[in-house]
UniProtKB/Swiss-Prot annotation:
Keyword Lyase: yes
Record has rRNA-binding as a keyword: no
Identification of the protein by name: L-ectoine synthase
Keywords: Lyase
Family of the protein in this entry: Belongs to the ectoine synthase family.
Pfam families (alphabetical): Ectoine_synth
Gene: ectC
Source species: Virgibacillus pantothenticus
One GO MF term attached to the UniProt entry: ectoine synthase activity
Record's function text: Catalyzes the circularization of gamma-N-acetyl-alpha,gamma-diaminobutyric acid (ADABA) to ectoine (1,4,5,6-tetrahydro-2-methyl-4-pyrimidine carboxylic acid), which is an excellent osmoprotectant.
Gene3D superfamilies: Jelly Rolls
Length: 128
């Protein structure tokens, strides 16, 4: 059994940040469960381009407001606490945070934990 609190992660190597977001990595590849789980903060007023060409991501918004645009179609979906989206087609998308957003994110294959986005908006597929 694995039990962790957010306090166990903040300020450690399991917390990764960029200018627009901070991701606290609860479950990673080393845990050998087939997925990873992050608690991610998206900064208010930011626009973020992402394209997870190597991963499937499910996201559940638990705080804040914003929107996500599926770039291939121009479809825009409002996001608020209680909204989930699944990037099951490796969708290129833009995430716009109106307020700070807190998201619970599940990745498959699992993240190693040190990933940051490339210039093309995706996480490299790391093995260690």
């Amino acid at each position: 059994m694995i039990v962790k609190s957010l306090d166990d992660i903040i300020g450690t190597d399991d917390e990764t940040s960029s200018d627009n977001w901070t991701s606290r990595r609860f479950i990673m590849k080393k845990d050998n469960v087939g997925f990873s789980l992050n608690d991610t903060l998206i900064k208010a007023g930011t626009t973020n381009f992402f394209w997870y060409k190597n991963h499937i991501e499910a996201v559940y918004c638990i705080e804040g407001e914003g929107e996500i645009e599926k770039l291939e179609t121009g479809e825009i979906y409002k996001l608020k606490a209680g909204t989930m989206y699944l990037l099951n087609e490796h969708d290129k998308h833009e995430l716009r945070a109106k307020t700070q957003m807190r998201m619970v994110c599940v990745f498959n294959p699992p993240l190693v934990g040190t990933e940051t986005h490339t210039e093309e908006g995706y996480y490299p597929l790391l093995t260690e």
